[in-house]
Amino acid sequence: MQKSYGVALESPTGSGKTIMALKSALQYSSERKLKVLYLVRTNSQEEQVIKELRSLSSTMKIRAIPMQGRVNMCILYRMVDDLHEINAESLAKFCNMKKREVMAGNEAACPYFNFKIRSDETKRFLFDELPTAEEFYDYGERNNVCPYESMKAALPDADIVIAPYAYFLNRSVAEKFLSHWGVSRNQIVIILDEAHNLPDIGRSIGSFRISVESLNRADREAQAYGDPELSQKIHVSDLIEMIRSALQSMVSERCGKGDVRIRFQEFMEYMRIMNKRSEREIRSLLNYLYLFGEYVENEKEKVGKVPFSYCSSVASRIIAFSDQDEEKYAAILSPEDGGYMQAACLDPSGILEVLKESKTIHMSGTLDPFDFYSDITGFEIPFKKIGEIFPPENRYIAYYDGVSSKYDTLDEKELDRMATVIEDIILKVKKNTIVYFPSYSLMDRVENRVSFEHMKEYRGIDQKELYSMLKKFRRDHGTIFAVSGGRLSEGINFPGNELEMIILAGLPFPRPDAINRSLFDYYERKYGKGWEYSVVYPTAIKIRQEIGRLIRSAEDTGACVILDKRAGQFRKFIPDMKKTSDPASDIYNFFISAQAREKYGA
C-alpha cells in the first residue's frame, strides 16, 4: 500500500481475507487521516463485512455505514410509485422535491424526512449497533425516519462505508457521495471484495439495451400524456412505432434462432430505409422525443411522482447506441424477451479507471492467473497468492468422465445418465449438497429425472425467498439445485457441516452467444488470447469459486465432483483434482475415512 496505488491478494476461502483487509485498511487510513470504502456485489457479502466489523469493534472504535442508493433505501418511493425502470437522477429529483415540500411546511409530503435524521438516537443505532442496510431500513420503517437521509447525515463521521460496486462506479452518484462524506478520491482506501467479479461488473455498468418492452412502456406513457406532435403529422406514438417496427424487423430478418452481432449504424439504416427519412431528420425527432420526456418528468414531479420518463430514456439510449465505439463495444441484436438491441461493453478498463485515483486492495479466492485480471481491468499492481492453508486430506475433488454437458452430445440418454449419477451420489453419500448446473435449462431438464427431495434456486428468486431456502437448508439439511455463477456460488458462508458436498453437473462454460463471441474476437485481436480470456479462465474461476464454498476451517471436510469428461483440462488450475469412475462410492469412502481420522486421530 505504501509503494503502489493498489495491491492484489488471492487467498483461500476461510483464510481471513475480509478481517485482514479491514484491519489493515483501517489502521493504514487512520495513521494518514484517510477513510475506507468497502465495495461489495451482493447483500450477503455486505452482511459478512458487517459481521467482521462487529468482531473488530471490541478492540477498536469503528464508525461504519452500510450505504446503498435511494432505490433500495427510500421508503416513500416504494409506497408511491411502481416503475419498471428507474435511474438515480430521477429518484434524486423526487427526493429533493419532497424535501422542499416538507421544509415549506407540508410535513405529509414525506413523513420520513424529519428531525430524527440527525438525532443522536439514530446515529447511536447506526454506529453502535453496526446494522446491515436491510436492518437499518427496517429501523427507519419502525421509527418513521428516512434510512437514506439518516445515512447521508452521518456520513461525515464515518470511518468506513460499505457500498455496492454499482453505487460507486456511477460517476455522478459517486461524486455526490464523496462530497457528502467530505473526502476526495485520493483520501480513501478502497477494498474490492470478490475482485474476480470486477471485469463483469465494469462491463455490466458500461452496457445498456433498448427493448421492445421498454418501447411499449414509452408508448403507454405517450398516450397517458397527450401524445403530442413532434413534427408535422408525426406524433410521439408514431415515432415510437417507427422505432419498434425497425427493431422488430431487424430481429426477424437477422436473428434466426439466437442473438447476433450487428454494426451500431445498422439500426439507423433500418430507420432511414423503412421510413424514407434522412438520419438528420430521425435524430431531430429523437431530440424532440427526449424533450417530450422532460415534459413528462416535470408533469410527474408536479403530482408527487418520481420524475422518470421512458420516452427520454429510449431517446437518449438510441442516440448513444448509434454513436457507440465499434472497437470497445459490440452491438447485439436478440430475439429474447420480445426482442432487444444492446450496446455490450467489451473493455471495462475505462469504466474502472476512476478506481485508480484511490488506494485499492483487490481481494478474492480466485485472482490467478493475475495477468488475465490485470489485462482486462487495467490494474498493474503487486500480486500475492496464498496457497491452500487447510489439511489437503480434508478435501476430495474429482471429475467423472462418464457424462458430458457438451451441447451437441446432450441428448435424452445423456440427460438420463447425468440424473442417475447425481441421484446415486445423493442417496449413497447423504450429505448437505449443492448441485450446480451450467444453466437453468439444464437444471430443469435434469430435475425432471430425479426422485429425491430437493430445493431449487429458480430463475428470478427474490432475496427473501432465497434466505428462507438457505435457512431451511441449514436447519433441515438436504440438497439444493443452483446455477453456476448465481447467487449461491459465492459470498455466502456455509461453516462447519452446513455444506459438505458439491456436484458440478457439467462445466460452467460461458454461453456461446454473440456477446461471448465478441469478447473472444476482442481478446484475440488485443492479446492473442481469445480462447483463454473469454472461455478457459472465466470457467476455471467459476469452478474454483464453487469448490471454495466447501472448506472454511481446518476442521471442515468436503467433497466435490465434476460430472463432465472435459474437466480434465482444468487440472492445472486444480492440481489435486482426481479422476473417478465411481463417484458415489469414492465420495462415500472419503467421508468414512474422514470420520475415522476425526474419531481416532489417524
From Swiss-Prot:
Cofactor remark: Binds 1 [4Fe-4S] cluster.
Binding site for ATP: S11, P12, T13, G14, S15, G16, K17, T18
Cofactor section: [4Fe-4S] cluster
Entry keywords, A to Z: 4Fe-4S, ATP-binding, DNA damage, DNA repair, DNA-binding, Helicase, Hydrolase, Iron, Iron-sulfur, Isomerase, Metal-binding, Nucleotide-binding, Transcription, Transcription regulation
Residues that coordinate or bind [4Fe-4S] cluster: C74, C95, C110, C146
Locus of motif DEAH box: 193-196
Domain Helicase ATP-binding span(s) in chain numbering: 1-247
GO MF terms, alphabetically ordered: 4 iron, 4 sulfur cluster binding; ATP binding; ATP hydrolysis activity; DNA binding; DNA helicase activity; metal ion binding
Reactions mediated catalytically: Couples ATP hydrolysis with the unwinding of duplex DNA at the replication fork by translocating in the 5'-3' direction. This creates two antiparallel DNA single strands (ssDNA). The leading ssDNA polymer is the template for DNA polymerase III holoenzyme which synthesizes a continuous strand; ATP + H2O = ADP + phosphate + H(+)
Iron recorded as keyword: yes
PROSITE patterns per the UniProt record, alphabetical: HELICASE_ATP_BIND_2 (PS51193), HELICASE_CTER (PS51194)
Parts of the chain that traverse the membrane: none
Record annotation: effect of changing R566E: 35-fold decreased ssDNA-binding, 28-fold decreased ATPase, 10-fold decreased helicase activity
Gene Ontology biological process terms in this record: DNA repair
Effect ascribed to mutating F308A: 10-fold decreased ssDNA-binding, 2-fold increased ATPase, 20-fold decreased helicase activity
Variant or mutagenesis effect after changing D564N: 10-fold decreased ssDNA-binding, 15-fold decreased ATPase, no helicase activity
Helicase C-terminal domain sequence ranges: 421-602
Binding site for ssDNA: W531, R566
Outcome, altering K152A: 350-fold decreased ssDNA-binding, 2-fold increased ATPase, 3-fold increased helicase activity
Pfam families: DEAD_2, HBB, Helicase_C_2
Subunit structure: Monomer.
Family: Belongs to the helicase family. RAD3/XPD subfamily.
Function: ATP-dependent 5'-3' DNA helicase. Thought to be involved in nucleotide excision repair (NER) of DNA.
This protein's name: ATP-dependent DNA helicase XPD
Originating species: Thermoplasma acidophilum (strain ATCC 25905 / DSM 1728 / JCM 9062 / NBRC 15155 / AMRC-C165)
